[in-house]
A protein has these predicted regions:
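Core segments of cupin and vicinal oxygen chelate
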Residues: 1-55, 100, 105-108, 147-188
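Structured core of small recognition/catalytic domains
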Residues: 154-233, 237, 242, 247-249, ...
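N-terminal beta-strand motif that seeds the catalytic metal site of vicinal oxygen chelate
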Residues: 1-19, 69-72, 122-157, 174, ...
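Short, charged/polar, Gly/Pro-enriched secondary-structure boundary elements
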Residues: 53-57, 66, 114-117, 184-188, ...
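Short beta-strand/turn micro-motifs at beta-sheet edges
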Residues: 59-61, 130-135, 193-197
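Vicinal oxygen chelate
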Residues: 4-13, 47-48, 61-139, 171, 179, 222-271, ...
Length: 271
């Protein structure tokens, strides 16, 4: 396939606490440089984590942005070819150059429902850290899927199939959703629903992790809450929207158990 999912980014109100969460629960490791960039004092990045395949950026949330999932990204065999395909078949797509000094830079585009996507050339000179290397590592706990909401899932699925050459996994598609894959990771397109404000919203919805043992993860989450309460997962079943939110995330066809990270990002766990 031409495209591989290699990147996901979160706006965080506490990068250090969230990094501890992902390191402790999922065994993710830093694979880009940590610390403030000397050449750019405004760059407060603490480095990016990885599961060996996909990098996770925890970016300090600036004014005007909401905490939570912000964008994801593809590494491409031929950036020029994909760019021309987008311009020809989806001429209304917004393009802009990726920010200087970030680890996964190239172009920023939007899909038909407004989801922000970074696209970068494999082996490109602007890739840094683990993104610049072909080899990664295998680990039992890793990012399994990224979920997007759309009013018309079939049309959005067509976009990802046509532009990025993802293929449908029919056995994992269901309940109005469509599951696509790059051969390793999954992109799940869920239908919008009218039973809550959140389920009506198009765009990034949640992420999913594959784990080897759900009960072991639950115990580790309990221990994390005792040892580092600031890095503990957020409760889903709280407030007047809690039950609706729990029911919504539980309805994901790829998940078995749902949690939320310290910033409230919803995470589906599956074995």
């Amino acid at each position: 396939m031409n495209a591989k999912i290699r990147h996901c980014a979160i706006w965080s109100d506490g990068c250090e606490r969230s990094a501890r969460f992902y390191e402790t629960v999922f065994g993710m490791r830093f694979f880009t440089a940590q610390g403030v960039a000397e050449r750019d004092p405004t760059n407060r990045s603490r480095g990016q984590l990885s599961d060996g395949v996909i990098g996770l950026a925890l970016n300090p949330r600036p004014p005007g942005y909401r905490s939570g999932l912000d964008h994801f990204g593809f590494q491409l065999q031929d950036l020029g070819k994909v760019s021309e395909r987008i311009k020809q078949d989806y001429p209304d797509t917004l393009f802009t150059k990726g920010l200087e000094g970030v680890a996964f830079a190239g172009l920023r585009i939007t899909d038909p429902v407004g989801t922000h996507i970074d696209i970068a050339q494999k082996g490109g000179a602007n890739l840094r850290g683990g993104y610049s290397r072909d080899e990664g590592w295998e680990q039992p706990r890793h990012l399994h899927h990224i979920a997007i909401r759309a009013k018309k899932p079939a049309l959005l699925a067509e976009y990802y199939q046509k532009v990025f050459e993802l293929t449908e996994v029919k056995i994992l598609s269901g309940e109005g959703g469509i599951c696509l894959t790059d051969g390793k990771s999954y992109l799940l397109i869920r239908p919008c629903e009218n039973y809550s404000y959140r389920s009506m919203t198009q765009g990034l919805d949640h992420v999913g992790f594959k784990v080897e043992n759900l009960e072991a993860v639950k115990k580790e989450l309990d221990n994390l809450e005792k040892s580092f309460p600031e890095s503990a997962p957020r409760k889903i079943l709280v407030g007047r929207n809690g039950q609706t939110l729990q029911r919504d995330i539980d309805s994901c066809s790829l998940g078995q158990y749902a949690i939320a990270d310290p910033d409230g990002v919803l995470i589906d766990l599956t074995t």
